[in-house]
Design a protein with these regions (language model features):
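Short solvent-exposed loop/turn micro-motifs enriched in small/polar/acidic residues
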Residues: 50-53, 73-75, 123, 132-135, ...
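Contiguous hydrophobic, core-forming segments of folded domains
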Residues: 62-112, 177-179, 188-193
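Flexible, processing/modification-adjacent segments and terminal tails
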Residues: 11-16, 84-148, 153-157, 162-164, ...
Length: 312
């Protein structure tokens, strides 16, 4: 899925930061002048063994006021409401976040992981160049170290992102007011499909009463706030690969990991490094009735090495 260079003579902006800002100004949810809307995605997810499952992902936005996200994926169900004006968040969920939902959340609307990487290394981003992907012209920026972001020069929106062997493809952009959302998102690991998302968007004249309001019931704490890691060793990131790994750990009374197992992973090549990393974690002991007790936790490991650019 690598994009091949093109010698097209069309004059285009070659400054990545300017193109990114232009794209973000066109995306629904990233500015304050959206119209109220509802985005719905039907997801097909594939686990480490290739088993298929389905999920739905809904975003309801009343700009400047509220945003509501609902995810339904087998045993995992989430409702998250944000009072944008008062900066109040509320959530209720069941089960653990499936790994492929995490992958999708980092790619919905824009390739957040790649954008964040570029933000950490602006000095490495060269002037963008025109390239071709399956006969489609793209305007691409790369860091010479494994990460590429490509825009469609015709609509100034994201088309493609690559982090080593991870590929994210955006297509069928859908208008909503003066903004857009991707109607199609595909996430690949090497040539293996991990996530397929098909979306729709509609304007909403009025949301049901109380639908967007933060409930009086207390918000559930985030899963990661239920434990505290007090000691860790660096993750071995010597392979030029990208991927996320979900690991279940059994922690003893002293906070040491007694057992670790892979729940799901994007890339089996990375499981050994993730297990070793998890095995060496030390948690703050969990107390019950004044006594330390064992517990289980699900952790998510991101494997995204940083190598010096090839031309340095």
């Amino acid at each position: 899925m690598a994009a091949a260079s093109s010698q097209g003579q069309v004059m285009q902006n070659t400054n990545y930061q300017q193109e990114l800002q232009h794209a973000e100004s066109l995306l629904a949810g990233l500015t304050t002048n959206d119209i109220p809307h509802h985005i719905h995605y039907d997801l097909t997810l594939y686990d480490r063994e290739g088993h298929e499952s389905t999920a739905t992902y809904d975003i309801y936005r009343d700009p400047i006021l509220y945003e509501r996200t609902e995810i339904k994926a087998a045993d995992y169900q989430l409702t998250h409401i944000t009072n944008v004006r008062d900066h109040v968040d509320w959530q209720h969920y069941t089960g653990d976040v499936p790994l492929k939902i995490l992958d999708f959340e980092r790619a919905v609307i824009l390739p957040r992981t790649a954008v964040d990487r570029f933000a950490q290394e602006p000095q490495n981003i060269k002037p963008m160049q025109m390239q071709q992907l399956e006969d489609t012209p793209l305007l691409c920026a790369n860091d010479q170290a494994g990460t590429t972001i490509c825009f469609s020069p015709l609509i100034h929106l994201f088309a493609y992102a690559q982090m080593f062997n991870r590929t994210i493809m955006y297509d069928q952009w859908l208008p909503i007011g003066t903004h857009s959302v991707p109607g199609s998102i595909h996430i690949y690991q090497d040539k293996k499909l991990l996530v397929e998302a098909t979306g729709t968007v509609e304007a909403v004249s009025k949301f049901p009463d109380h639908f967007m309001q933060v409930p009086d019931a207390p918000s559930m704490p985030s899963p990661e706030s239920q434990y505290k890691i007090i000691k860790s060793k660096s993750l071995d990131q010597s392979d030029a690969r990208y991927g996320n790994i979900q690991v279940e750990v059994s922690v003893d009374e002293k906070g040491h990991v007694a057992k670790e197992s892979i729940i799901d992973s994007d890339d089996k090549h990375l499981e050994g490094a993730a297990r070793k990393f998890a095995r060496n974690l030390v948690f703050e002991p969990r107390m019950k009735d004044g006594q330390p007790v064992p517990f289980d936790a699900s952790i998510y490991v991101e494997y995204y090495p940083f190598f010096p650019p090839e031309d340095q």
